[in-house]
Amino acid sequence: MNLVVALTGATGVHVTRILIEKAPWPVTLVASEQGRAVYEQECGAFAALEARAAEVYADSDLKAPIASGSVPTRGMVILPCTVNTLGKIAHGIGDTLITRAAHCHLKEQRKLILCIRETPWSLINLQSAGNVAAAGGIIMPLSPPFYMMAGRDPASVTMEDLLNAYVDRVLSLLGQEPVENWGTVR
């Protein structure tokens, strides 16, 4: 079964690349138009990311297999997830492949992880996150698990270290055993 990875138009798309590289499952990739634009601005050619995926669909392709709940998946991660996408999912709007696939994951009770990058949150964002969590989704703000750097000189910790630790937490929510956890680093 494939892991569905979607990216929307928030910054922080380096984490998307790391997730796809580290995922032990084949990846089905979907990007919003703005997600593609941000990726190209921050990381370079989007085609390089597409080459790492087993399948790639346009966000406008509502006939893609993942638009149906009958197609099994490992789960879905929206990384990064804009608060606009969060709001659409929270209120039942499935007008794109990303939001439709998210709704399929909720209704089929499959893992749906929304990695919200934007801060601070308004009351509307908090309520939307609550709605998605109540429906079975996992809200995981793009905040690295700093505790995984315990005992290290902060000057020696790189952005890549923090992003890798974050991705390991995401993958652990999908059933992948983490290389390190709090018990091994403390």
Q: Which residues does each predicted region cover?
A:
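A cross-family phosphate/adenosyl-ligand binding-site feature
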Residues: 1-113, 117-186
